[in-house]
């Protein structure tokens, strides 16, 4: 639907090459016959490196997950991911702001004006809910609660995901990415915990997509081949079918999901062997 609307609205734009990344990158690549796909970590590094070539640490906090990369000599040297749940991510903040009757944007603005941020720790959403209710009973203002939530997101990333003992040693050139960092309260909390400023690009929530686009552009400069991405006419006849089968290749009998698209394009997933 997005591609159809985009190509209809901007008929003079010609897609030279296309690439996908993130969750479902191979599904999207096969569905729309994109030329390339790129692992999400590389997409984030490529975009951060474009804006800050000397970047040595990247932290990406999205709606559902946290990804952190340590960069050494221009190479990703270590990766940290949240392993348990989405606590401490964008959805976490949205859940609590909505529960208290505010939009995430309003909550962020209030948090920046907090005088005494509440110490809510960095626990999961279930326990955090109890902490928030207790803070309300103790007379904490909404601004102080929102500030406490922003701080908890930062502490969760630093001390539970990265397991840092000294945040000031993470790096000298840090880039923060992901939609959660568009929340100025989270950004400020992160800088205060580190004791230094970090770099946030205006379109922090689109850095993965930007890095992916850079990858497609670089590849095109090498081969100059015509794109295989579906045209507007081809999109009008787009079809997608899904079925599951048990693989008979061995005794494991993996349950495979077969995604079939028009033009005999297929993506098979679920193979655990």
Residue ranges and their predicted role:
Residues 130-159:
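Adenine-nucleotide phosphate-binding core of ATP-dependent small-molecule kinases
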Residues 1, 55-75, 250-260:
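Gly/Thr-rich phosphate-binding beta-strand-loop-beta motif of the actin/hexokinase/Hsp70
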Residues 73-116, 214, 218, 261-265, ...:
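Glycine-rich phosphate-binding loop plus the immediately following alpha-helix
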Residues 67, 218-273:
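Acidic, glycine/GT-rich loop-and beta-edge segments that sit at the periphery of enzyme/chaperone cores
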Residues 46, 90-95, 202-230:
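Glycine-rich phosphate-binding/hydrolytic loop that grips phosphoryl groups
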């Amino acid at each position: 639907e997005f591609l159809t609307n985009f190509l209809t609205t901007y008929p003079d734009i010609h897609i030279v090459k296309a690439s996908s990344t993130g969750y479902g990158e191979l599904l999207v690549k096969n569905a729309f016959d994109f030329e390339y796909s790129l692992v999400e970590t590389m997409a984030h590094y490529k975009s951060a490196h474009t804006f800050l070539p000397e970047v040595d640490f990247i932290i990406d906090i999205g709606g559902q997950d946290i990804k952190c990369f340590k960069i050494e000599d221009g190479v990703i040297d270590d990766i940290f991911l949240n392993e348990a749940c989405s606590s401490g991510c964008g959805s976490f903040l949205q859940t609590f702001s909505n529960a208290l009757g505010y939009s995430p944007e309003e909550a962020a603005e209030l948090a920046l004006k907090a005088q005494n941020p509440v110490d809510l720790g960095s626990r999961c959403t279930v326990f955090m809910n109890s902490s928030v209710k207790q803070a309300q009973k103790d007379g904490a203002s909404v601004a102080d609660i929102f500030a406490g939530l922003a701080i908890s997101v930062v502490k969760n990333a630093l001390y539970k995901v990265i397991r840092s003992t000294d945040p000031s040693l993470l790096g000298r050139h840090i880039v923060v990415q992901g939609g959660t960092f568009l929340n100025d309260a989270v950004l400020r909390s992160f800088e205060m915990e580190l004791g230094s400023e970090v770099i946030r690009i205006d379109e922090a929530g689109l850095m993965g997509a930007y890095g992916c686009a850079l990858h497609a552009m670089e590849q095109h400069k090498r081969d100059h081949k015509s794109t295989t991405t579906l045209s507007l006419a081809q999109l009008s006849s787009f079809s997608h079918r899904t079925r599951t089968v048990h693989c008979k290749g061995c005794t494991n009998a993996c349950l495979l999901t077969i995604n079939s698209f028009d033009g005999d394009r297929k993506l098979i997933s679920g193979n655990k062997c």
